[in-house]
């Protein structure tokens, strides 16, 4: 195994010396399990003797959102985290996620589809074509008015992202149509001014 960095702990289920079998966890799942482990150590050491212990389960809605949007296999622990996270999400305790559901027209109990195709793209839209910190601000705020405002902005950015993506995709497909050699086992397309925030999505749609 390559030399590990100098650190108190290198938390990665894909390390060669880890036998957990959880190498397909999304990063958000790894972070959540780390938080649980740290919380357990603090509890055992009496840290919460005169302090309130945090309810980590309330964050499972964020874990579910991140897991689905990372497109990891929804099996094993990933599936369990998403299943429980969707239950938390249905309670609308996170103002940002509730606002996302509202602007996305999700008026039913959310499922993995809603996370992957309705809510996730809106969270990511700020980073693709707008202000990168909008998504994190939305998910971190406890202010319902602020959450609504940010969600509306992200919804608008997501529409803009779709328009830009479609324009780039159309140009890429035109190139493949005009050049028979471009549509072989490996396709090469390029364009002046293509937005870097959508080229990855377009590439995946050319497969």
Predicted feature residues:
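Short alpha-helices
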Residues: 5-48, 56-68
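Flexible loop/turn segments at secondary-structure boundaries
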Residues: 2, 18, 195-198
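Hydrophobic helix-and-loop "lid/oligomerization" segment in the mid-to-C-terminal part
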Residues: 40-207
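Histidine/acidic-residue-rich catalytic or RNA/ligand-binding cores of hydrolases
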Residues: 4-5, 132
């Amino acid at each position: 195994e390559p030399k590990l960095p100098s650190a108190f702990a290198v938390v990665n289920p894909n390390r060669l010396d880890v036998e957990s079998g959880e190498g397909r966890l999304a990063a958000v799942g790894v972070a959540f399990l780390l938080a649980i482990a740290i919380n357990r150590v603090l509890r055992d050491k009496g840290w919460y003797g005169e302090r309130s212990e945090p309810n980590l389960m309330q964050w499972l809605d964020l874990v579910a959102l991140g897991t689905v949007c990372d497109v990891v296999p929804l099996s094993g622990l990933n599936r369990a985290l998403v299943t429980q996270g969707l239950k938390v999400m249905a309670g609308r305790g996170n103002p940002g996620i509730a606002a996302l559901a509202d602007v996305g027209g999700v008026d039913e109990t959310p499922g993995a589809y809603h996370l992957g195709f309705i809510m996730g793209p809106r969270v990511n839209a700020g980073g693709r074509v707008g202000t990168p910190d909008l998504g994190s601000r939305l998910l971190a705020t406890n202010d319902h008015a602020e959450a609504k405002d940010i969600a509306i902005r992200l919804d608008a950015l997501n529409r803009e992202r779709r328009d830009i993506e479609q324009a780039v995709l159309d140009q890429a497909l035109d190139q493949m149509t005009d050049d028979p050699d471009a549509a072989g086992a490996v396709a090469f397309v390029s364009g002046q001014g293509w937005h870097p925030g959508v080229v990855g999505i377009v590439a995946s749609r050319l497969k």
